[in-house]
Amino acid sequence: MGDALFRCRLSAPAVPLPHVWEHTVGSCHAPLALRADWQNQLRRCHNELGFRYVRFHGLLSDRLGTLVRHRDRLVYSFFNADCIVDFLLSIGMRPFVELSFMQAVLASGVATIFSYRGNITPPTDYRRRAGRPSS
């Protein structure tokens, strides 16, 4: 990496610095949000630190069971995702939703990252990924 040069005009009018980092907290992946200890800690963070949003990956992940194959049919269940969102709303917080990893039943491959094995391959059929049946 090369050098960087920063300049500051001290005679310029002061400009407020928005503290965007004070509103949102990151929390790894969504299945953790189903745990009581995680919920207690987040509730405390909200109450004591004022966080209003929480960001995590995997709200639609395999571990939450949002999409499974049953007898050659894709079956959606948002029960766990709903439980997470309902909890956040109940304590005055909101999810910062990240749509990231591919569900295994739609994936074109098996390449994954991180310890929870988020699938990083594109869908086999983009129409099915969007929830539309293929012809």
PLM feature segments, named:
Residues M1-S135:
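Non-catalytic accessory regions flanking glycosidase/transglycosidase catalytic cores in CAZymes
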